[in-house]
Amino acid sequence: MASFIEDYALLSDMNTGALVSRSGSIDWFCAPRFDSRAVFAALLGEREHGRWLLAPLESVNPAPVEEVRTERSYRENTFILQTVWFVGEASVRVTEFMPLSGGTTIVRNVEGLTGDVTMYHELALRFDYGKTVPWVTRYEGVDATGAPDPSADMLVGMAGPHALVFRGDSLPEGDPESKAETFTVSAGQSYTFTLSYFASNHNPPAPVDYPTALTYTQEQWQEWSDLYSPADSLPEAEDEDAAPAHMPEGGQVPTGVRVSEQAEQAPATISAVREVEELEEAKTSSLLLETGSNTAAPEVDEATYHELAQTAASQVVAPTAEDHREEANARYREARLRSLLVLRALISRETGALVASVTTSLPEVLGGKRNYDFRFTWLRDVAMAMDVTLTHGHERETAQLRNWILRALANNPRRIHAVYGLAGEKDDIERRLALPGYEGSQPVRSGNGSGDQFQGDALGQVLVTFANLREAGVAEDHLSWPIQKALLNAATERIGDTDRSMWETFGEPAVYTHSQAMLWAAFDAGVSAVRDFGLDGDAATWEHCRDAVADDILSRGFNADLGCFVSTYGGTAVDASLLQLPQIGLVDWDDPRMLATVQRIEQTIAHPSGMIYRYDNSDSQDGFEGQDNPHFISSLWLAEQYIRSGREEDGRALLDTVLACANDLGLMSSEYDFDQQRLTGNFPQALAHISLIRVVEALGL
């Protein structure tokens, strides 16, 4: 049975990803791309659907004799996972990663730390989501002289066009469908295992050198993350009246930068704490002397001890509100950096696409039917990701995402899709897989049938992002501006059209306020391109359309009786997409109409935790019965709204709630089930992490 979603860690080589559980099992791995058919699919079924388990034997013992516990973390600013297993008094460290040096490989290294640990190793190779069991052959290695070399032995599994090669310091034996073994690791010993995918009409790839691959992969991740350095200190001013060089206009010190006279108190505080510690040691030494220790004790009587301890303790400065604020800021910066790394992990090096998630059919409601394939690329996700990569100086990734959008839209901008394949293909075929589903949640899908839906917000988001690129100095080329003009002309035909909203509901189509607002943003971007940047285009028509859509939204998308914006023209309900209205500049963050909309959201679609649902589904508007769970993306949009409209403390509180719901590695899925305290939905989700980055930026960190 699969682990809880929150127990999984992501490994990535920027072309595909794998999920490894806290129990040491890789239960999900698609090769060679994010959207390929799964090699390991136990996540959506059982062990016979494919997995790779590497863990202490005691951890899989139904009646363990010794206590087993784990500690895990990523190496700093990487996706190199390190898990320390403690088995009684003994321990081992398992290091796992996907090399960034080419190919499609998973590397797992077991290093003995203390004592002896017996490891259990099971390899169930599969193709086609567990349906195909490959023919596995063991090849005996030889050295340069032709003599047998057991260290070069390998297992090769093959079926049709697919093949896998497994190498290691100890190869598991067993029946054709599952290989298993045990081996003992002592302190100082190390075992390395690699699994590589390759096309069956090619030779197996060369062996991976563990130290070299580890060093290179770590350097690549850290080189990318080094572009983000949130902890830059303020430079010293030339005189006491001069403002720091990078202080914003108005002389405001950026949020999160601590400038306080209390910094001078730190040495005294530390000294006082040390004095208390020394007194404790003195008292302990005295007690040891009384019980026979040969350690000489300082001459401190009981009264003197208590007097000195009280004096020293009185000098200890309790953490201030500012201290707590800075601790929180440090957490937020760390969460933003991890989110940036998640974003990079989900951008395909091969195609430049951003995959929404590495998984399919993880249920938004456990046991329910809201199960979708997220191994696709949504235009809005790519557009919002470009804003992030551009802001953080990742020019290569910005160019990759930009070029992917242009290739995807070059087919026919007038028939824009919401969802595309990773190469920009339009594939609307959705099929059901013969898998049990995560905790029995059916159906299990391959493919996404919402691709042919028109979603006005996707068109608008793309044009807004290209406008941001222009503002940043990115020049238009022979393809980019003509495609944008085609999109703008197509948008003129979509004013007032019905759609199924950005939430892709299965209910009746309607005129969604958010979709129309994104058309407004598209026209506004087009007008600016001509008027402000001198590009050619029918600015007069686009300006007329922009103003007409704005009037329409303010008359039909705004409910005068409620005093707020509503989800659909003429409706009364609100949904989380309305939180994007100030993001695109249709209204100000603190516009009274927007504040009233926020209040309505709090009243109707908020969970007691402060997180919010996407919408109220009491009338089954999305085609399913019952309410889904609080939504990470929507909740983070609300947190940003709070911060930018002057409710910073509310924004921080909501951000804290969201971070508490992420897993121990800082990864988020689609939603969170508070009743069961479980992550739900596909994992990890790119747009959730993009939205978190926006919130931290709103705090000025």
What is each residue range found by the language model?
Residues M1-L701:
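Acidic, mature catalytic/reactive cores of soluble proteins
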